[in-house]
């Protein structure tokens, strides 16, 4: 069973969860530092972002603010981070996409493109 932990339980996180579900993640959980949030898009919030390493799961950051996303990603081990690509995105065969990046529905990424980590 594929399990995904998403850091950030808000609108961007809901979009990331939808992509994850569409590409085969069966279990999705959230981590967020706002203790008043208990669910996001029907998925449980099970802890603070600093606790994400306590479970055996792939990890992605579902926070829209690029600066905050970068700061959090730098504190995480690369081997846990995954890249998510929506099935309705068009990605050329030779594209290189860094870990922690999410490619949204309708995106077109042309040949020769390189996308960094956490974009």
Language model features with spans:
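Phosphate-bearing ligand-interacting subdomains
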Residues: 36-92
